[in-house]
Design a protein with these regions (language model features):
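Hydrophobic alpha-helical bundles in membrane proteins
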Residues: 76-298
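Charge-dense, low-complexity polyampholytic segments
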Residues: 67-79
């Protein structure tokens, strides 16, 4: 394979954000086509370098070809879209029916989510897995926040021990996801965005656990919480079904706005310093991958 062809294929694969198996298969087909074209040109008297250069130029921009192939393969089926949104609908159903107060139902749902996430992870990471992974990581994030409710001094000591381990797990999974596509990383952290923003509005640490105040707050704000998860489900369905990458990016920018509006409206702006810090952190964690891909798209 000539250097021109190799460079062309590397650019093509770098721009094509689809399943690795499909991407490698398409790249192999392109490679075969380019090598055949190059051999034909060599038989007509051109040097190997000139032949490979003309073959590459005749095929066109690798970025444009990658975009066209992406739009062909990026659209998921309705089955994949609905299954991707299913965990959001299940959580919304929990709050609608008030089953979130029943530890049995919550435990069953958590076990279901963990099982499906592990199954999907070991089955090649299909497109529907990423929202499920977000809920799979949820206990890791929530545990870190609840550690701050320990007696003064002990909470920070426990957090200093726990947080590095939690970050290791979180970063490992995010990196594995981002290798396929940064947009999937945003799709994955979306459930954590909702949870952290509502934590910030309901209180944190001792305030969250004291005298059942958080239960009363959850009951009061249940409708807004349901709206947040429904918005997340709708955006997930749109993301899976849309073809063009720019529209996928736009669909992921809608939930943060809906959730931010819901939280501020429900709390009437009464969010303390730590609450705003958690809120801004969670919004940034969700929006940064989308912003990076928007810049890359431009």
């Amino acid at each position: 394979m000539g250097s021109n062809i190799s460079h062309y294929l590397n650019r093509f694969k770098a721009c094509l954000k689809i399943d690795k198996t499909i991407r490698d298969g398409v790249a192999e087909e392109l490679c075969t086509h380019l090598e055949e074209k190059s051999r034909e040109l060599e038989e007509n008297g051109l040097s190997k370098e000139e032949a490979s250069k003309i073959a590459v130029q005749s095929l066109g921009s690798p970025e444009l070809i990658a975009q066209q192939i992406y739009e062909t393969h990026a659209q998921g089926s309705w089955k994949e879209a609905l299954f991707s949104a299913l965990p959001h609908f299940l959580v919304a159903l929990l709050f609608t029916s008030y089953y979130w107060q029943n530890i049995v139902y919550v435990s069953i749902m958590l076990a279901l989510i963990v099982g499906i996430a592990i199954y999907g992870w070991h089955r090649g990471k299909p497109i529907w897995i990423f929202p499920w992974l977000g809920y799979y990581l949820m206990p890791v994030v929530v545990t870190g926040i609840l550690l701050l409710s320990l007696p003064e001094g002990w909470g920070w000591i426990a957090a200093l021990i726990y947080i590095p381990l939690a970050l290791f797990v979180f970063i490992h999974i995010v990196r594995q996801t981002a290798r396929r596509d940064w947009l999937y990383a945003s799709l994955m952290v979306a459930p954590m965005l909702v949870t952290l923003t509502w934590f910030s509005s309901l209180g944190a640490g001792n305030e969250l656990l004291r005298d059942g105040m958080w239960l009363a707050s959850l009951q009061t704000n249940a409708l807004w919480i349901v709206i947040s998860f429904i918005a997340l489900a709708a955006a997930t369905i749109a993301f899976i079904r849309l073809k063009a990458r720019r529209y996928k990016i736009m669909s992921l920018l809608i939930p943060p706005l809906v959730i931010l509006f819901s939280v501020i409206t429900a709390s009437r702006g009464n969010i303390d310093y730590w609450g705003w810090l958690i809120l801004l952190f969670s919004l940034s964690a969700f929006a940064i991958p989308v912003w990076m891909q928007a810049r890359a798209y431009q």
